Structures are given as structure tokens and as C-alpha cells.
């Protein structure tokens, strides 16, 4: 590759034409230069037309784009000249009409657009679309429509013959839709609209198809029906059934609404929308809601839920209870095109009633969509309140309509009350122990409320400046101490986004003048700092500690001293690690670096300019010292262990030492990133940072650590690009030189060098990317260096260069700039396929894979062979040479495994190419592909069979050729041919019923099944015949003859047991076919043969069939029962088979005894077998066995049990007919509503809604939280006995007492990760409140033992307060979710069951500053 780009003569001429056309805008043409310019444009027009006529010679990647762009400009200039009033263009117009744009030439251009669109990428398609648009414009100004109509009509006919999966068809129809009546399309192609709708689930086609359908239908309404509204109904009938057919499918709904319904109804009379709604035969809620939303947005239906116009308020409530519809309902309920329009009271009421269903949503996309909708509603509420208050003031000032004034002010108060309620609701969902999704949603809504200006103390910079309006009231969010406590508590959340959102809210709070002083008086900075320090010393909580540190720094007055103290602590830690690398291996250096990084982001360097340089200097030195202290751990490279020998038996686990070291490097890199982005640095400091990155990327032995270094490296490169670009060139120069170094101990992917090269190159902003060009050339030079004899195979510079080239193509920021290098890189990869050195082959294969993904895209996609080999000239011969060479060498005496790799990779390329009509370049590969079909490697034969299928143009001819060559004397060849036939035959027979060929294949059964001794090729033949039977209807006589042969073969082979896996699979295949195609009267015999078979694969196939198809009504059930019970007792029966036996036996009443099930569960059986046993227990449930079965199942209800067992136990309960009458079972099903797994929650909810709550069938899938709430009321209506109250109390007090609130918290030693609860979904406090509410609703008192427990716990709590001289604070004792929920529950219990103690209890809580939300907590 040379630095001077070489252009072909065509490219040079196209560039000249393009530059000339751009330079000669008609506005610049005058009488003096007119003749010369117009003559030249005519000449260029002729040249461009002739270029198409000549077949576009020397077409390459560049020319493919330059040509249509140039021609578009030519057509545009021609149109501008003819349309110009300043130029006499009659002579030019005549030339265009008679010589340049004749009908024949217009057709040539059209054909060019049509041909090249199919295989073009997005840039080419855009260029061709522009070209066609300019062509149409020029034709319309050149010819009258009466003349042009025939040409366009012929084009339309040709367009309609284009495959429907190509976008060009839809674009061209859309482009022609304004020129004539397109109703004839429906007449000519009656299924066109239906076929078009069927493609609306394709992301690639939806936009183009949608525009086409809209243009077509609008054209028909305007030109065929003459915009006559009386024909709207008839117009709807043309497409209604097609729309309704697909719009119900979720894959289609969104795209049909977006690309068809909205633009269609937007351009039609409102009556069209109304009539479409009325003629809907199926009132599907989802469809109705989506259409009502469209009507709202278009201003056709403003408030569709009002006055029961389309549905009742009760139906709206039921719809919002279901996850499938809740977002649509909420959006319609809260949306208005007139934002200041008063909000109806039922809207506020419905939102209050059902807002919680959005806060428990586990789907991120739905939560984000809800937050967006809620934002619009909050701002609408603000605008509405503002408008109402303004109008009330005007009326008051005018002293008019006092009743209307009161009504408007009442509506303002209603809005204020709703927002106050919303703030309280948010508080409850920020409480310790609430779900992650509730936390995130609450924080986002809190942010929206603050941005909307609901608190007038909010600083201006935090308000939303779009459509600014002021509330006529203020809600003091920023001065609320409960919000302050909740937000500080969330700073230690395990979730980074929760910490960030909380931190953002706190920053707004302390920025407000009215709240800053209040909070500083409230907060105990020293206690917070102690907590933060404690968190920083804990590896798993280090990020939380760093976040708290940042918060303390933000509220502290003396920021410089705080930074100095933190630096001193960190410096001491680093020094200690250097002095005692074992004793201090667990020092929290990483978290302290993280804390400093966050602090520096908030540090005001401009106000502390003199101190900043000293701080930065200290920090850079600390980073360098930390690296020196940890490098012996992360750079250790030895076969004797992952750590240096001195760490052996040191008492600290290796993983802990490594994790602390890597984290120190990662957090130090983030600190450097902060410094590089924000603070001034000298050239020397930049050099030292750059040297550090080079050393780290060159010596670290762990790929994860490379990723840790990258943030800092990226910031470094961007900084250098702005200030010292020469540093980057030096870095690249050093990197390329280091490729050849033998002291690197490079890993097989070249360590951190590719990261270094790509990161530096990504920072380049110079036009043309000269640094990328130069680096790529240098890398290619290194990669192409000849390898001397006896070269070290593990330290090749060529390997490192190829890995760097691969990294460049993979890096998203660089890949777009590498198009011109693809051909050379592909050639480089291919040339090394058959290299002797594994490392070089391996890196070349990785490069090839990256390039293949770039060229072909997703797996399964293919490109035209002609286009591919035209685009990458020279590759066809290279691929052919490699394939032939590898086959020849592999067939010789010295066989090497890498030759198999070469064959496989070339075949993989061929598999992605599809034949092009008239192109013969693939035919030379056929001979080699046939040779590959005989290769001794199974994978090569398999790949070759699929390639042959892709290359074949005449399937019938290929099939007959393969059959003719089939012989059992050559088993590899036979196998390859059978695999190829498996690919070719089904596709051929799908288009024709060639019975002669089918009979010919089936007649080979004697040779291939009876005479053949190889079970692998026998099985391949069976699979081929199976494909035929699945594809075609075979005459009964032929089918019976073939199945009879299979039956006899199975009986004969099944009697002779040998240890042979291929025979096992072969017999299983025969058995599968017999069970599928054998006459039903023989099926019992076949199944029994399979069960008695000594081959486990045959047994397994039989059991799998019986599991789904066998019924115990058979007359031979005793034989089956005997054999299945016998199998159950076989000690070494396959676990999978044993599980199937249990499932089949469980379907026969009284076959599996309770004792047998118990034994299966208690003995050492597989999980599948135990699951089958659990599922079968439902049949054993009765009033007599309930306690025994219940005790067995209880072990599987727990959250600690696997999901499969919990699900099996749920299904066992729901299969029991009496479950909906048994209070204990119903309570367990209620518990399943809080399960960690959504499938279990939904199944429990479905059962309860259907069988216990007994709702309408379309309500069975309501939200599980709604079901839980409804259940609590329904349950106590049905069950009110003292036994039920006892069961509820048992659950409630078990939860209350299972956690010891007063025990000292223990931290796990050497713990690197937070130990999560088994159930991440349950809100334990909310569930406890549900149970307490059920107890209250029964109207029964609780027993004395439970009241004693309440008294005892209350006394213990008060004693703890007094003994410990207790005072709670943010991040304090009550911030623990377990403690918070239990004190809150205790408060509720005291209030209800010991009311005389309640006031004193609250006073004590208040005195000790207990979490304010505990005191104010009540059920919404």
C-alpha cells in the first residue's frame, strides 16, 4: 500500500464532472459563458449515460457512490437550467428531450437504479433514491404528463415485479404516487396491501413499506374516489382487514401505528378515523387503546375515556390493572393536546388508586416510558393549575362570577393535593427495603417534580426552562427532612444508578438557600464521615463509601483540608502496602482513589487555583507509587502460581489479593481520567502519565485490567490531541516499535498493545485521519514481513501487528474510517490460513472473523457473489488457490490440522455468497466443493454440503448427480453426499412433486440400510428420507413399504446389543420415524419394543414420545405399567429417563404411591426426577393425606429453593381441585405473588384471579401487586375463623422475630461481593402490612401470646434506646432495611393492639431522632 491514492481513469473523469457541475450553478451562468457551460453539461450528460450503457466498467467501491451522486447533480443542474427564467434554455431543453433524456435513456437510468438498489448499502441506496427523484423532476419539466404517463406506467409494472422484500419497490411506488391513479395496483395485485402489511415487523422494511402504503391509500382516496367523503367507508374496506390481521400481533403493532395509521389518518378527514373505529369487529383492548391514542394525538378524540364514550370508568380501572394495557391507559388518561385544559377529578382518583402498579414494574423500558408519561402529566398539572389560578384572579379582579372563581380555585387545590399525595407516595417508595425499581422510579419522579418548579425555593439553574410556568402554590420538597434522610440512606445503595440519582437530588437540596442551613444543622458531619470511612475500608461497599465521602465534601465548608486529609490517609495506605505487601494486601486503596476521583469532580479549582497544582502533583505521585506497590501482583507471569511465591500460605486468599490490586489500578485510572478532563497539567506530568499507561498495557497479565486502564488512557489521548498532538505520534511510534520487541512476554492477543493503538487512533480528529493511514500502513508492513527459519513461534511481531489491525476494525470509532483497508486486510488474513505457525493462523482467523462480520453483517446474511468479487478484486482467485492447495496438501501423506481450518474458513466465505444470474465466477469452486464432500473430517463434509446448496443453480441436476455417485464403498463420500441431499432435496421438492426422484431415493433403502454396515451413513439416509416425508405427500403403498423396512430393521438391530454410540443414535432415529409414520395399530408394539430395548437412546426416544402422546386408556396398559415400574427400579437408569418414567406413571391414577414419591424426593435422585415427583403430588392431595403432602412440599416453597422446585410446587398446588377452598394453600399461593421469579408470580396470580377471586377471563393476567391487594380483602371475606387468624399471626410474627435487631452487625471476612437476598422482588414491610390488614379485617382479636410478644419487643427496643444513649441519624441504625421495617410494623401493632402505649412510644421514637418516615408511615 502506498501513500498516494491511485484512481482509475473513470474515477478521475467522474470527479472532474462532479466538480464542474458543482462549480457551475445556473445562478452563475450569464450570456457570456452560457454556451460553453451548457455545451459542457450536455457533453457530461452524454458521458454519464454512455457509462451506464457500457456496463459501468471498472466499477469499484468508490465509483459506486461517486457515479450516482454525480449523475444526480447533472440531472439537478439540467432541471435548474430549464426552469430558470434568466437563461434562454430552449436549445438545451430540445437537446435534453431529443438526445439526452429520450425515453430509451430514461429507461436505462431506471434500470440502473433498479439493478443496483438490491445489493447496495445505505449510502448507495440514498444516492440512488436521490438520483431517481431528480430524474422524475427532470422528466416532468421536460415532457407533458400525457406523454410521460406511458413511461411511468411501464415503470410501475416493472416495479411491481420486484421481490416484495426489497425496499426499492416501496420507495419507487411512493415516488410515483403523485403522478397517476394507483388503484390499478390493487386490481393487478389484489394481495399487494396484505403482503405489504405482512412485512411491517421488519425493522429494515417498516419505514419504506409504511410510506408506500400511506401514499398508495391516499392516492386512491384523492384520485380514484376524488376526495368524496361518501366513499370513505368503501376506501376503508380496501385495507381494513389487512390492517386488523396484523396489528393485533405485538411484532407489528408499533410499526403499523407509527408508519401507517398516524400519517394516514392525519391526512384524511376525521370521519375516516371514526368510521374505522366503528367498523372494528374485534374490540381488542390493546388495539382500541392504540387507536384512541392516535386519535388523541391527532386531535380527533380529546378525552376518549370521558362520558363512557368508548369504555366505562370501571373498564378503564380493570385495564390499568394489567401490565399489557396499563401504559396505554395511563397515557390516554393523562394526555391532552391542550395542556392548560382542566383535569377531571376521576383522572387524579384513578392515578392515586393505581400508581403503585408502575413502581413495581421490573421491565426497564416500561418504567422509562411511564416516567416520560408521568413527566408530561406533572407539567400538564402545573400548566392547568397556573391557567385556573390566572383565570380566577382575572375574575376576582373583574368582580365577576364568584361561583366560577370558587370552582377554579377548588380545582387548583385538587391539583395541589394530588402533588402533595405524590410526594408522600414517593417517600414510601424510597424507604429502606423497598424494591430497586420503586427506588429508581421514585427518584426520577422526584427530579421531575423539582424541575417543574413545584418547590419555589428551587434554584433557577435546576428548573426546566422549556415552556416555563409557575405553580400557584409551593410544596416544600427541598426543606423536607424526611426526604433528606431517605436520600442520604440511598447513597449506600448497592445500585450505582440509585446512588447517582440520590446524590443529584441532595446536591439540589443543599444548593437551595432555604434548605442548606437547615440541613447543616440537622446533619452530624462527623458521624457521616465515620460511616463513610467504615464503608471505604470494606471492599464490597467501597463505592458506596466513596459516594458518601463525596456528599460530605459537598456540604463541608473547608474543602481543601478535606482533600488533604484524604490524600494523607491514602498516602499512608500506599506506604504501608509498599512496606508490608502481605499484611496490608487488603488495604482499601481502590475505594480511596474512587473517593478522591468523585471529590475532585466537585472541587472548585478556579477558587483554589494556587492549591490545585500541588494537589494534582501529589495525586499523580500517589498513582505512580500505588502502581509500584501493586505491579508485582498484576504483572506476575509464572507457571508456578498466579501470585509471586512470597504470597504462598500468607493467610489471605489469592483472589482477595488480586482483586484489591486490580481495583487500585482501576480506580487510579478513573482518578487520572478526572484529572485529565478537568485540571491543568504540565508537559512533564502528561509524559509521566503516558509512560505509566504504556508500562501498564505492556506488562499487565490480565485482559480485565486493560479495560480498567482504558478510561484514563482515553482521556489522556483526547487531552494530548488538543494540547500536544506530538505525544500521540510518539506513543504510536513506540507502540509499533514494541511490536517487534521480544521482552514483552506478549499474550496470544498481544496484551494491551491493541488497546493502546486503537485508543490513540480514536482520539485523532484531523480530516482524512493521516495518523490512522500511516499506522495501518506500518502495521501491514510488519504483518507482511517474511518469517525467518527457526523463529520463536510465541513472540512474532507479525502476530502482534495482525492483532492490532483486528482491534482497529473492531473499534466502533475507527471501523467507519477503515473501509479502504478491508480488501488488503482480508487478503492478509486469507494468506495466513495455511501457515505452519499456530499463533499466526489463530490471529488471522480472528481478523478474518471481524472482517467477515463487517462485510456480511449478521449470521445468515449473504451478499451477491458478483458484487463481492467485484468489490474485492483478486479475492476470488486467492480463495480458490487456498482451497485447492489445502485440499491437495490434506490429501497427501503429511496431514496437518491447520489445513482443515483453511478449508473450513474458505467454505465459510463461500457459504455467505449467493449466485448471481449470468455470473459464472463460482463454478470453478464446484470441483473443490465436491472433493470436500469426501473429506474425512465430518465438519468439512457438513459445511461443504451447505455450500453446494448455496452454489447450486439447478437443484434437480445436482441431486441426480449426487445419487449417481453414492456408494457404500466410499463411506466419507457417501456421508457427504447424503448431507448435501438433505440440504437440496427438501427445497427442490417444495416446488415440485417429483415422484420418480422420491421413489429413486427410497429404493436405495436396501443398499443404504441393509447392505450398509456404517451406522453414521445409515442415520444420514434416514434423515434424508425423513425430510422427504415431512415435505411431500407420499402414496400409502410406497410409505407402507418403506416403514415396513424400518420396522423389520429395528427389530433385527435391536436384538444385537453392542457398545456403539452411533448404533444407539441410529436406532433412536428409526424409532422416531416409526412412532411418527407407523400405522396406529402397531404403536403400542413399537413403544413396548422401545421400552424393552437394551439401548438407552431408544428407551429415551420412546419415553419422550410417551410423555406427550401416550394415553393410559390402551388395552395393554398393564404391560406398560409393569415395564415402567420395572424401569423405575433400575438403579443405573439415565436420570432423564427416570424423570420421564415418573411423569408418565403420575398420569395414571393410583400408580405412584405417596410412599414412592416420598422416597424419590428423599433419596439421591436427579433434579428432574424430583421435580416430576413434586408435580405428581397434586394427585395425592386429599383431606387424609394433606398434612403429609404439605410437609413434603413446604421445603420447596422457600426462596432459597431453586426456581424449578418452587414452580413445581406451585403447579402441584394449582392442580389440586380443592386448592381454592383451602386457606393454607391460598395463603401459600398469596406468598407466591411475592416470589422473586416473574413466571411464578404470574402463574399464582392467574390461578387466584381465575379460581378464587373469580374475575372475568380477560382479567386473569392482572398485575400481581393488584392481585395481592384484592386477595387480602377477598380472603377475609371467605375465611374468618380463629384458625385462619392464627395462621396469619404465625406468618406475621415469624417475620417480626426472625431478625435480631439488637445483635451487633458482623462483616464477612475476605468478602469481595455483596451477598444478595434470595428474593430481590419482595417488599417485606408491604407484605407484612398486607397480612396485618387481613388480621384486622377479620374482626378477631389476636391471642395473648402475640400481644406479649409485642410488649416484649417494645420494651427491648426502649431499653436499647436508653442503654445505648441512642440517637438515630442518616445512615444510622434505622437505615438498616431489616430494622426499619420491623420498627414500623411494631409501631402499627402497638397502635392497634396496645393503643394506650402508642403516644408514649411515638414520643420516645421522636426523642431519639428515629427515622422520620417510621413515625409518619401509614398505609396509603
UniProtKB/Swiss-Prot annotation:
GO cellular component: cytoplasm
Extra facts: Present with 7110 molecules/cell in log phase SD medium.
Keyword Cytoplasm: yes
Primary localisation category: cytoplasm
Subcellular location: Cytoplasm
Disruption phenotype: Loss of methylation of the 2'-O-ribose of cytidine at position 32 of tRNA(Phe). Increases occurrence of 1-methylguanosine residue at position 37 tRNA anticodon loop of tRNA(Phe), indicative of a loss of wybutosine at this position. Simultaneous knockout of RTT10/TRM734 leads to activation of the general control amino acid (GAAC) response and severely decreases cell population growth.
The family this protein is said to belong to: Belongs to the THADA family.
General function of this protein: Together with methyltransferase TRM7, methylates the 2'-O-ribose of nucleotides at position 32 of the anticodon loop of substrate tRNAs.
Protein name per UniProt: tRNA (32-2'-O)-methyltransferase regulator TRM732
Membrane spanning residue stretches: none
Keyword tags: Cytoplasm, tRNA processing
Region (Required for activity): 748-754
InterPro entries, sorted: ARM-type_fold, THADA-like_TPR, THADA-like_TPR_C, THADA/TRM732_DUF2428, tRNA_methyltransferase_THADA
Amino acid at each position: 500500500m502506498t501513500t498516494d491514492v491511485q484512481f482509475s481513469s473513470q474515477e478521475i473523469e467522474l470527479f472532474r464532472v462532479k466538480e464542474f457541475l458543482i462549480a457551475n450553478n445556473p445562478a452563475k451562468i450569464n450570456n457570456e459563458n452560457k454556451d460553453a457551460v451548457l455545451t459542457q453539461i450536455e457533453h457530461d450528460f452524454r458521458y454519464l449515460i454512455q457509462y451506464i450503457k457500457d456496463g459501468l466498467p471498472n466499477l469499484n467501491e468508490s465509483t459506486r457512490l461517486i457515479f450516482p451522486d454525480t449523475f444526480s447533480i447533472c440531472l439537478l443542474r439540467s432541471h435548474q437550467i430549464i426552469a430558470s427564467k434568466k437563461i434562454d434554455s430552449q436549445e438545451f431543453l430540445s437537446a435534453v428531450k431529443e438526445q439526452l433524456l429520450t425515453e430509451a435513456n430514461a429507461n436505462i437510468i431506471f434500470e440502473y437504479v433498479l439493478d443496483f438498489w438490491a445489493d447496495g448499502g445505505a449510502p448507495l441506496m440514498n444516492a440512488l433514491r436521490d438520483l431517481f427523484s431528480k430524474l422524475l423532476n427532470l422528466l416532468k419539466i421536460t415532457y407533458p404528463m400525457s406523454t410521460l404517463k406511458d413511461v411511468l406506467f411501464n415503470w410501475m409494472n416493472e416495479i411491481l415485479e420486484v421481490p416484495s422484500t426489497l425496499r426499492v419497490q416501496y420507495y419507487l411506488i411512493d415516488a410515483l404516487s403523485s403522478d397517476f391513479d394507483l388503484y390499478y395496483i390493487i386490481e393487478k395485485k389484489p394481495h399487494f396491501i396484505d403482503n405489504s402489511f405482512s412485512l411491517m415487523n421488519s425493522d429494515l422494511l417498516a419505514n419504506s413499506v409504511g410510506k408506500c402504503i400511506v401514499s398508495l391509500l391516499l392516492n386512491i382516496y384523492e384520485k380514484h374516489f376524488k376526495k368524496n367523503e361518501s366513499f370513505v367507508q368503501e376506501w376503508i374496506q380496501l385495507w381494513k382487514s389487512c390492517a386488523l390481521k396484523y396489528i393485533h400481533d405485538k411484532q407489528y403493532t408499533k410499526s403499523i401505528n407509527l408508519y401507517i395509521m398516524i400519517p394516514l389518518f392525519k391526512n384524511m378527514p376525521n370521519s375516516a378515523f371514526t368510521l374505522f373505529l366503528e367498523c372494528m369487529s374485534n374490540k381488542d383492548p390493546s388495539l382500541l387503546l392504540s387507536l384512541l391514542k392516535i386519535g388523541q394525538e391527532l386531535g380527533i378524540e380529546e378525552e376518549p375515556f370521558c362520558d363512557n364514550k368508548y369504555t366505562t370508568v370501571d373498564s378503564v380501572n380493570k385495564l390499568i390493572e394489567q401490565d399489557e394495557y396499563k401504559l396505554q391507559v395511563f397515557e390516554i388518561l393523562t394526555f391532552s393536546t391542550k395542556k392548560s385544559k382542566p383535569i377531571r377529578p376521576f383522572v387524579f382518583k384513578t392515578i392515586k388508586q393505581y400508581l403503585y402498579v408502575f413502581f413495581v414494574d421490573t421491565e426497564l423500558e416500561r418504567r422509562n416510558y411511564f416516567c416520560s408519561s408521568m413527566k408530561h402529566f406533572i407539567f400538564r398539572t402545573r400548566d392547568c393549575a397556573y391557567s385556573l389560578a390566572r383565570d380566577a384572579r382575572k375574575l376576582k379582579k373583574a368582580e365577576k362570577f364568584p361561583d366560577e372563581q370558587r370552582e377554579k380555585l377548588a380545582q387548583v387545590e385538587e391539583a395541589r393535593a394530588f402533588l402533595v399525595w405524590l410526594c408522600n407516595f414517593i417517600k414510601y417508595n424510597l424507604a429502606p427495603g423497598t424494591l430497586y425499581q420503586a427506588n429508581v422510579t421514585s427518584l426520577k419522579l422526584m427530579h421531575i417534580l423539582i424541575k417543574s418548579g413545584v418547590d419555589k425555593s428551587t434554584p433557577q439553574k435546576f428548573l426546566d426552562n422549556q415552556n416555563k410556568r409557575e405553580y400557584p402554590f409551593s410544596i416544600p420538597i427541598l426543606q423536607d427532612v424526611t426526604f433528606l434522610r431517605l436520600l442520604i440512606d440511598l447513597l449506600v445503595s448497592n445500585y450505582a444508578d440509585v446512588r447517582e440519582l440520590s446524590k443529584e437530588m441532595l446536591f439540589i437540596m443543599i444548593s437551595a438557600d432555604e434548605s442548606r442551613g437547615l440541613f447543616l444543622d440537622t446533619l452530624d458531619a462527623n458521624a457521616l464521615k465515620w460511616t463513610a470511612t467504615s464503608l471505604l475500608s470494606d471492599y464490597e461497599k467501597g463505592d458506596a463509601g466513596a459516594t458518601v465521602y463525596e456528599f460530605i465534601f459537598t456540604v463541608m465548608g473547608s474543602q481543601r483540608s478535606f482533600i488533604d486529609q484524604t490524600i494523607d490517609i491514602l498516602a499512608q495506605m500506599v506506604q504501608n502496602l509498599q512496606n508490608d505487601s502481605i499484611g496490608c494486601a487488603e488495604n482499601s486503596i481502590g475505594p480511596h482513589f474512587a473517593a478522591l476521583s468523585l471529590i475532585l469532580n466537585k472541587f472548585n479549582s478556579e477558587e483554589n487555583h494556587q492549591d490545585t497544582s500541588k494537589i494534582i502533583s501529589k495525586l499523580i505521585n500517589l498513582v505512580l507509587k500505588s502502581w509500584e506497590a501493586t505491579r508485582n501482583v498484576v504483572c506476575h507471569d509464572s507457571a508456578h502460581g498466579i501470585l509471586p511465591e512470597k504470597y504462598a500460605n500468607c493467610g489471605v486468599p489469592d483472589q482477595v489479593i488480586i482483586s484489591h490490586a486490580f481495583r487500585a489500578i482501576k480506580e487510579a485510572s478513573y482518578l487520572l481520567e478526572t484529572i485529565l478532563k478537568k485540571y491543568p497539567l504540565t508537559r512533564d506530568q502528561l509524559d509521566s502519565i503516558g509512560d505509566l499507561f504504556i508500562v501498564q498495557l505492556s506488562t499487565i497479565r490480565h485482559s480485565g485490567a486493560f479495560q480498567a486502564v482504558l478510561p484514563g488512557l482515553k482521556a489522556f489521548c483526547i487531552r494530548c490531541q488538543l494540547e500536544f498532538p506530538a505525544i500521540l505520534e510518539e506513543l504510536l511510534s513506540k507502540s509499533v516499535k514494541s511490536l517487534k520487541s521480544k521482552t514483552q512476554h506478549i499474550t496470544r492477543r498481544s496484551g494491551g498493545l491493541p488497546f493502546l493503538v486503537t485508543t490513540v487512533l480514536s482520539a485523532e480528529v484531523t480530516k482524512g485521519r493521516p495518523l490512522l493511514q500511516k499506522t495501518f500502513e506500518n502495521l501491514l508492513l510488519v504483518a507482511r514481513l517474511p518469517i525467518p527459519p527457526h523463529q520463536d513461534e510465541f513472540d512474532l511481531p507479525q502476530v502482534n501487528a495482525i492483532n492490532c489491525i483486528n482491534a482497529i476494525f473492531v473499534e466502533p470509532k475507527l471501523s467507519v474510517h477503515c473501509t479502504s483497508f478491508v480488501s488488503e486486510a482480508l487478503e492478509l488474513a486469507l494468506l495466513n490460513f495455511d501457515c505452519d505457525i499456530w499463533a499466526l493462523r489463530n490471529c488471522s482467523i480472528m481478523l478474518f472473523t471481524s472482517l467477515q462480520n463487517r462485510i456480511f453483517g449478521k449470521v445468515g446474511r449473504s451478499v451477491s457473489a458478483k458484487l463481492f468479487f467485484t468489490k474485492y478484486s483478486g479475492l476470488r482467485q486467492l480463495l480458490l488457490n487456498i482451497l485447492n492447495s489445502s485440499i491437495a496438501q490434506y490429501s497427501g501423506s503429511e496431514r496437518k490440522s491447520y489445513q482443515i481450518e483453511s478449508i473450513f474458513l474458505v467454505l465459510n466465505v463461500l457459504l455467505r455468497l449467493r449466485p448471481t444470474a449470468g455470473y459464472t465466477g463460482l463454478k470453478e469452486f464446484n470441483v473443490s466443493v465436491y472433493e470436500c464432500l469426501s473429506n474425512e473430517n465430518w465438519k468439512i463434509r457438513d459445511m461443504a454440503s451447505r455450500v453446494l446448496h448455496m452454489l447450486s443453480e439447478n437443484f434437480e441436476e445436482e441431486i441426480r448427480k449426487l445419487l449417481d455417485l453414492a456408494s457404500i464403498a466410499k463411506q466419507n463420500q457417501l456421508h457427504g453426499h447424503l448431507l448435501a441431499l438433505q440440504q437440496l432435496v427438501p427445497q427442490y421438492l417444495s416446488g415440485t412433486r417429483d415422484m420418480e426422484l422420491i421413489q429413486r431415493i427410497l429404493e436405495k433403502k436396501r443398499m443404504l440400510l441393509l447392505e450398509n454396515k456404517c451406522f453414521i451413513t445409515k442415520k444420514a439416509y434416514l434423515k434424508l428420507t425423513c425430510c422427504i416425508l415431512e415435505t411431500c405427500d407420499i402414496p400409502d403403498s410406497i410409505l407402507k413399504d418403506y416403514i415396513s423396512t424400518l420396522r423389520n430393521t429395528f427389530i433385527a438391530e435391536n436384538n444385537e446389543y453392542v457398545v456403539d454410540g452411533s448404533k444407539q443414535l441410529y436406532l433412536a432415529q428409526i424409532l422416531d420415524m416409526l412412532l411418527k409414520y407407523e400405522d396406529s395399530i402397531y404403536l403400542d408394539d413399537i413403544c413396548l419394543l422401545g421400552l424393552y430395548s437394551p439401548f438407552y437412546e431408544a428407551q429415551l426416544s420412546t419415553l419422550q414420545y410417551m410423555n406427550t402422546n401416550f394415553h393410559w386408556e390402551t388395552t395393554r396398559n398393564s404391560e406398560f405399567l409393569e415395564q415402567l415400574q420395572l424401569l423405575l427400579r433400575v438403579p443405573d437408569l439415565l436420570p432423564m429417563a427416570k424423570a420421564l418414567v415418573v411423569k408418565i406413571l403420575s398420569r395414571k391414577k393410583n400408580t405412584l404411591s405417596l410412599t414412592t414419591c416420598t422416597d424419590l424426593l428423599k433419596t439421591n435422585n436427579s433434579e428432574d426426577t424430583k421435580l416430576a415427583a413434586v408435580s405428581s403430588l397434586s394427585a395425592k392431595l386429599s383431606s387424609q393425606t394433606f398434612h403429609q403432602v404439605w410437609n413434603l412440599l413446604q421445603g420447596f416453597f422457600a426462596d432459597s429453593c431453586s426456581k424449578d422446585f418452587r414452580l413445581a410446587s406451585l403447579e402441584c398446588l394449582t392442580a389440586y381441585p380443592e386448592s381454592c377452598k383451602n386457606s393454607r394453600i391460598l395463603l401459600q399461593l398469596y406468598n407466591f405473588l411475592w416470589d422473586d421469579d416473574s413466571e411464578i408470580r404470574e402463574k399464582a396470580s392467574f390461578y387466584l384471579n381465575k379460581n378464587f377471586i373469580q374475575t372475568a377471563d380477560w382479567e386473569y393476567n392482572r398485575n400481581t401487586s393488584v392481585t395481592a391487594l384484592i386477595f387480602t380483602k377477598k380472603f377475609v371475606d371467605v375465611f374468618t375463623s380463629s384458625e385462619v387468624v392464627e395462621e396469619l399471626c404465625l406468618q406475621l410474627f415469624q417475620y417480626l422475630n426472625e431478625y435480631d435487631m439488637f445483635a451487633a452487625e458482623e462483616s464477612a471476612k475476605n468478602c469481595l461481593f455483596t451477598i444478595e437476598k434470595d428474593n430481590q422482588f419482595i417488599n417485606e414491610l408491604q407484605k407484612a402490612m398486607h397480612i396485618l390488614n387481613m388480621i384486622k379485617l377479620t374482626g378477631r382479636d389476636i391471642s395473648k401470646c402475640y400481644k406479649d410478644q409485642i410488649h416484649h419487643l417494645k420494651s427491648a427496643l426502649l431499653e436499647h434506646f436508653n442503654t445505648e444513649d441512642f440517637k438515630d441519624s442518616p445512615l444510622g441504625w434505622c437505615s438498616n432495611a431489616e430494622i426499619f421495617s420491623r420498627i414500623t410494623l411494631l409501631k402499627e401493632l402497638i397502635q392497634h393492639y396496645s393503643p394506650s402505649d402508642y403516644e408514649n412510644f411515638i414520643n420516645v421514637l421522636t426523642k431519639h431522632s428515629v427515622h422520620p418516615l417510621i413515625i409518619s408511615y401509614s398505609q396509603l
